[in-house]
Amino acid sequence: MRKTSLLNSNISSVISKMGHTDMLAIGDCGLPIPKETERIDLALIKGVPGFIETLKAILEELQVEEVLIAKETEKVSPELFTKIKEIIKDTKITFISHEELKKELKDCKAVVRTGEQTPYANIILKSGVVF
């Protein structure tokens, strides 16, 4: 059994294959996922699992150098945005429109779908290097 906290084999598999600047998205339960992008569906019921707990778990395993967030998030869901900033600390944030974020999903290695129902609870994580 794995010693790290992330137990989901599909997420671990995607992360293990990611290189520098590859992208992985985490989305709320309403985020449209392109057919060509791998979907890792964790949604069980409304709110479970949550976006924040999923983000925390993935960040324990993935080195991230930049995050892409819809600029609408800060205004529409300020509490969520504050929590994201606390978690990612000094990681670079690039703001794009929600429509642009949805287009970027086509270039992601996968989208992790949560049960989150907070508006704009979506993020794209750009992989960094550990050296």
From Swiss-Prot:
One of its GO terms (biological process) is D-ribose catabolic process. It is found in: Cytoplasm. Pathway: Carbohydrate metabolism; D-ribose degradation; D-ribose 5-phosphate from beta-D-ribopyranose: step 1/2. Gene3D superfamilies: RbsD-like domain. Its main location: cytoplasm. One of its GO terms (cellular component) is cytosol. Belongs to the RbsD / FucU family. RbsD subfamily. HAMAP family: D_rib_pyranase (MF_01661). Catalyzes the interconversion of beta-pyran and beta-furan forms of D-ribose. This is D-ribose pyranase. The gene is rbsD.
